[in-house]
Amino acid sequence: GARVISVARQGYGNALTGGINAARGRYIIMGDCDYSYDFSGLQPFVDALREGYDFVVGNRFSGTMEKHAMPFLHRYLGIPVLSYLGRKRFHTFIYDFHCGLRGFTATSIRSLNLQCTGMEFATEMIAGFANGNHKIKELPINFRCDKRKGASHLRTFSDGVRHLYFIVCKKTLN
């Protein structure tokens, strides 16, 4: 079952770090709870972790994507460009740097000592795994429209700039 925890400081990175630190299992799988990810399809993630992968990340572009599940500029400009730059900078094959459906071993994620508190945490995580000689796998996933009521917390321009700054300027922690 799920356990709800409270995190004192706001921010995507802070929330995920709080969840990672509170997790009790050998494997941790994270995903946005906006109905855009199909959590009934997690078996390939679990299988990959059991096969010895340290980090498993979804690829929304290689699975089925519902119409309007992702804004046009994110789908055709922002995510592809930032992912391309991230692949070159961190020498990894991951094509969807910003997919929120991810799995990892508790030991490996905690060894990365991730520091980012905002959305750029997603890029920092990939950089940490890529630069730390970890075994990585990317899996196609299905991506659906956000079914929540209310506004998204994503701030396209400022979040994109922070991801870009991390890719270009930050030294990796490993």
Annotated model-derived regions:
Residues 1-5:
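Acidic donor-binding segment of Leloir-type glycosyltransferases
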Residues 7-22, 27, 39-119, 145-154, ...:
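Acceptor/aglycone-binding surface of glycosyltransferases and processive sugar-polymer synthases
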Residues 88, 132, 170:
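Phosphate/oxyanion-binding loops and surfaces in catalytic or ligand/nucleic-acid-binding neighborhoods
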Residues 123:
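DNA-recognition element of transcription regulators
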Residues 35-37:
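Acidic metal-phosphate-binding loop of nucleotide-sugar-dependent transferases
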Residues 163-174:
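C-terminal, non-catalytic tails of nucleotide-sugar-dependent glycosyltransferases
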Residues 92-93, 114-117, 126-144:
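Catalytic donor-sugar/metal-binding loop of nucleotide-sugar-dependent glycosyltransferases
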